[in-house]
Regions:
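Classic N-terminal secretory signal peptides
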Residues: 1-22
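TPR/TPR-like (Sel1-like) alpha-helical repeat modules
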Residues: 73-90
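TPR/TPR-like alpha-solenoid helical repeat scaffolds
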Residues: 91-116
Length: 119
């Protein structure tokens, strides 16, 4: 089963302006808000959606992105680990690529580890 995902994983550079035409009311994954740099709005939307769909990997990955960008590294790592604890889901990226939720979470964790090691 593939999920269509409208998200930005900042640590992987997956941001594209291709979805900028969507209205804010359909930005349930926080993609548009993250892409616009409005991390407060993104976090509010994602947290609200996670109350309904707590296990959706695209929401966990996007919230982890918000946490990472706002300096909450331990919270971001916990969400990436939570994605890895669930079955892998094929995700359509805004670029058109299809990537496993596990691959995205693993790459983000590896990148965080590299950043910590170089500090």
């Amino acid at each position: 089963m593939r999920k269509t995902v409208l998200f930005v994983l900042a640590t992987l550079g997956a941001a594209t302006p291709a979805l900028a035409g969507q209205s804010a009311t359909t930005d349930r994954t926080g993609y548009i808000a993250i892409a616009a740099g409005d991390l407060t709005t993104a976090e509010q939307r994602i947290v609200a959606e996670r109350k309904i769909f707590p296990q959706r990997p695209e929401l966990m990955l996007n919230l982890a992105t918000v946490y990472h960008r706002t300096g909450r590294e331990s919270e971001a790592r916990a969400l990436y680990a939570a994605v890895l604890d669930r079955p892998a889901v094929a995700m359509d990226l805004p670029s058109g690529a299809v990537v496993s939720s596990h691959d995205l979470a693993s790459r983000a964790l590896a990148r965080q580890s590299q950043q910590i090691a170089t500090r």
